[in-house]
Amino acid sequence: MKNAYYIGLMSGTSMDGVDAVLVDFSGPQPQLICSHTEAIPSHLLKGLQRLCLPGADEINRLGRLDRNVGQLFALAVNNLLAKCNIAKEDIIAIGSHGQTVRHMPNLEVGFTLQIGDPNTIATETGIDVIADFRRKDIALGGQGAPLVPAFHQQTFAEIDKKRIILNIGGIANVTYLPGTSEHVLGFDTGPGNTLIDAWIQHVKSEPFDKNGEWAASGKTNPDLLAQLLSHPYFSLAYPKSTGRELFNQAWLEQQLSPFNHLDEEDIQSTLLDMTCHSIARDVIKLSPEGELFVCGGGAFNTQLMQRLAALLPGYKLDTTSALGVDPKWAEGIAFAWLAMRNHLGLPANLPAVTGASREAVLGGRFSAK
């Protein structure tokens, strides 16, 4: 059978690099052929973090960063192809998520905005690009997120097996696969790594808390934890989605101001528990027991996985590796899958997940010609 090669490009709210994956969809399950992470240069990272919050001169900064991110994504593709020794002519299309700089679906006229000019990516790689996956769903009254549950359903669902797929990136999201004819459900639970990363970056200038070791050295403060979990987002009914607009450094500093007597490692432990408790609450609401498979950066945080397991005694906990998908690359593979769905003219959103009025083909095609 002829290969069906697509590339997926993903940079999430954690902004810890651009993941590029080459995936073959010619078989019944996606096959990861090659993967690469392109680091985000510090000057670009600072610009993106600034743009995620309201500020002056936004349109000029947006325009420049849109091109800069497009160039970085193109570099990620070219380095991936060099690493794999695959010719650009063998790739059907690139699926590019872009970099989210605003996600505000709940306004009177909701919107979401991802940058990383697909024209630039197409021009600099010589490969057609499919991008702008979220805004069609928003135009249909949906949240535009999460989009990965449709991929999770096709890849991980099994008859008579109740499964939850938990993706822990900057924001955490769950997909409930009931194993029956019931609707698949999915939504953002709240912060994943974004606040624990922000705190260790602020205090120690380290990019992330490896294995949760710093959090493990601290003691959770119950009063701070209760305050953090009182955020209105956690009591919203799904469909729901969130991002840095709600959970960011400025919000964190505001929450911490009455608790400046706490040790820094105790704050880190409490932030980790905020992530774990908010996830566990939503998982238990979906089903008190079942199988839980974790992907995303959080799957590699030993302390996070241990705390989550303790909060979910009714669940068998593992990573998506047990289902044949490397947890580090799962989201990149999902955006290659979204590109494939667009190329074949197939819908890729789940209205029961996003709240859209109907299924739709997502994304637009940007030709390299």
UniProtKB/Swiss-Prot annotation:
Pathway listed: Amino-sugar metabolism; 1,6-anhydro-N-acetylmuramate degradation; Cell wall biogenesis; peptidoglycan recycling
Catalytic reaction equation(s): 1,6-anhydro-N-acetyl-beta-muramate + ATP + H2O = N-acetyl-D-muramate 6-phosphate + ADP + H(+)
Keyword Heme belongs to the record: no
GO MF terms held by the record: ATP binding; kinase activity; phosphotransferase activity, alcohol group as acceptor
One Pfam family this sequence matches: AnmK
GO BP term, pick one: 1,6-anhydro-N-acetyl-beta-muramic acid catabolic process
Domain of life: Bacteria
List of residues binding ATP: 12-19
Enzyme Commission no: 2.7.1.170
Alphabetical keyword list: ATP-binding, Carbohydrate metabolism, Kinase, Nucleotide-binding, Transferase
Family of the protein in this entry: Belongs to the anhydro-N-acetylmuramic acid kinase family.
Role according to the record: Catalyzes the specific phosphorylation of 1,6-anhydro-N-acetylmuramic acid (anhMurNAc) with the simultaneous cleavage of the 1,6-anhydro ring, generating MurNAc-6-P. Is required for the utilization of anhMurNAc either imported from the medium or derived from its own cell wall murein, and thus plays a role in cell wall recycling.
Name of the protein in its database record: Anhydro-N-acetylmuramic acid kinase
Biological source species: Shewanella putrefaciens (strain CN-32 / ATCC BAA-453)
Source species taxonomy: Bacteria, Pseudomonadati, Pseudomonadota, Gammaproteobacteria, Alteromonadales
